[in-house]
Structure formats: C-alpha cells, structure tokens
Design a protein with these regions (language model features):
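Structured adenosyl-cofactor binding patch, chiefly the S-adenosyl-L-methionine
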Residues: 176-227
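S-adenosyl-L-methionine/SAH cofactor-binding core of RNA-modifying enzymes
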Residues: 63-92, 123-166, 177
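SAM-dependent methyltransferases
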Residues: 1, 127-133, 241-303
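Hydrophobic/aromatic beta-strand patches that form the interior of the parallel beta-sheet core
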Residues: 4-6, 34-36, 141-143, 166-167, ...
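N-terminal nucleotide/polyanion-binding subdomain common to many enzyme families
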Residues: 1-75, 259-274, 278-282, 303
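Internal, active-site/partner-interface "lid" segment
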Residues: 200, 212-255
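Long, intrinsically disordered low-complexity tandem-repeat segments
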Residues: 87-90, 95-126, 130-131
C-alpha cells in the first residue's frame, strides 16, 4: 500500500513512521510512506500556505490553490510519464488564486532572489512522488480530517486498508478553504474534540489502517483478536508472574484447557462490552450461547 500525506508540517511524521510496526511495515515492503510539504507547491518568497479569512475572524485559513496544485501533481504521478515542476510566476505575476487576491495579499509579488531554491525543492519532491507512485495503478483515495467528517472506527479502518493508495490532506491553523474539500473522497473525524492539526489525526488513522495489512503483525490473522475486530471489546490479557501483589491470574488461563480458555475469553469480551460499551451490542447478531450469557448478566444486574 502507498500512503501519502500533504501538510505544512511533514516532519511531524518522522518519529511515528520510523518506529515500531510502521517502520517494520516499510522495511517489509508492505507500506510505502511519504510525507509531502505543501509549501513545495507555493510560488512566493515566504512559501505562503495560509491567509486571513474572508468576512473576518480569528486565525488563518489554508489556501486552496497550493492544495489543488499539489493534488493534481500527485494524481499525475502514476508512473505513466514525467511530471513537470510547478510553474514559477512571471515577473510581476503572482500565483493564481481561485477567488482572487485578498486585500493586502503579498502573493502577487514578483519572483524574489532565492526563490529558485523553492523550485528545486519542488522538483525533488516531484521526483520522489514519481518514484513512489510507480506502484500505484490509479489516483489516490483522498481523505481530509475534519470535525464534520464520518466518525472513524475499526470498520472504517478495514475499508481503507483495501485501498491501494491513500492521500491524507491535513489542515492546520483555523482550517482549510472550503473549496478544497471538493477533492475529498472521504472526510473523517476522530471524535468530538479539537486537535492542533490534521497531522495528528492522520497518524491515528494511518496506524489503525496499516496494522490491518496482511503481514504487518506477523500473521494473516494477527489483528483478528483485537478489540472491535468482531465488534466486541477485547478480553483481559495477563503474563508472568501468575501472582503479583496478591493479584492472581485467572485459574482457567493456567489450566491448559484450550476450549475453556476460548470460552472464558469470549465471555470476558461480552461482559466487558456489555458493561463499558453496550452501544456496540445493539443490532449485533450473536449465537445463542452468547445471548444466554448476556441474559445472565442482565439478570444479575436486576438482583
């Protein structure tokens, strides 16, 4: 799978993607990850990616022009031809903006000394894009992270894991120009709270998706026993020693009876879900033995 991110802070991914399972997935060739800097698709000396909001208000809004240009470059990078670097503005001509310049916008200034370095960076970026995308057969499935999006869950992670190529476009500051959302195949939200940036949210989604890929956890069935894999919370886990500070490991786990262990784990998953996340049980199809066990828990609660 190819996973790409487009943001103003690509360095934020280094520690997460360079450690643990994310690193292993890349070393095994299961994952090809690349974080792109949105500034490589800007054309002013300050490499501006944001501006004041129309209508006034606090904060800065990410401009849609660099996002569209970057998206088009990434979509073109399918290994079917070379990619031209972003065009530099002519003398006295600024980068085009979808709805015109804001009052006081400095993006219309002519090319300043030193701007060639931005072009060189863009060329290198596009070279990286082309190399990574040689294994991509189609344009990326594009995801924005925003509060108005679909609530992310394990089912969503499984769906995304079936894609060949994912592109996460990450907001920052006050948000993203609404017109950029026309590029989205899907908008995802982690929950009803605010984060500093879309980079943080994308890391959570990427981790959840990558661990679903065959071979990442060491076996095809590696993720099947995790929480939410079958709609239930995971059963309690224990390791040595069998006794610690007077707390004992359940005897059934020491019995060697695999059938009894399996049933204990199933009942623990059911009970934990019943007590902590009963909403997950709504509409779930369960075998008769599971329903009888849940009924016994309900009866206990009424005593």
């Amino acid at each position: 799978m190819i996973i790409e991110t487009l943001s103003t802070f690509p360095d934020m991914y280094e520690s997460v993607m360079g450690a643990s399972m994310m690193r292993i997935a890349q070393e095994k060739g299961i994952l090809d990850f690349k974080a792109y800097d949105l500034r490589d698709w800007t054309h002013d000396r300050h490499r501006t990616t944001d501006d004041e909001p129309y209508g006034g208000g606090d904060g800065l809004v990410m401009k849609c022009a660099p996002i569209f240009e970057a998206y088009e470059s990434l979509c073109a990078a399918t290994g079917k031809g070379s990619i031209a670097a972003p065009a530099e503005p002519a003398q006295g001509e600024g980068a085009s903006d979808v709805a015109g310049q804001m009052p006081g916008d400095s993006s219309g200034a002519g090319q300043a000394p030193g701007e060639g370095s931005a072009s060189a960076a863009a060329e290198q970026t596009l070279s990286d894009v082309s190399a990574a995308a040689d294994r991509a057969a189609s344009k990326p499935y594009t995801i924005f992270l925003a509060p108005q999006g679909r609530r992310f869950d394990d089912a969503c992670a499984c769906e995304l894991a079936k894609q060949d190529r994912l592109l996460f476009i990450c907001g920052h500051y006050e948000g993203i120009d609404e017109r950029a959302y026309t590029l989205a195949d899907e908008v995802i939200s982690l929950g009803d709270y605010v984060l500093t940036s879309g980079e943080l949210a994308s890391m959570v989604v990427i981790d959840a998706v990558v661990r679903k890929l065959p071979g990442v956890l060491g076996a095809e069935t590696g993720a099947l026993g995790e929480s939410f894999a079958d709609g239930l919370l995971e059963y309690p886990q224990y390791t040595r020693p069998a006794t610690f500070n007077g707390m004992e490991v359940p005897a059934v786990l020491l019995s060697g009876n695999h059938g009894a262990v399996d049933r204990w784990r199933r009942e623990q998953s059911l009970e934990r879900t019943y007590r902590l996340r009963p909403d997950l049980l709504e509409g779930m199809e369960l075998p008769d033995a599971d329903r009888a066990f849940l009924q016994s828990l309900s009866t206990e609660g009424r005593r």
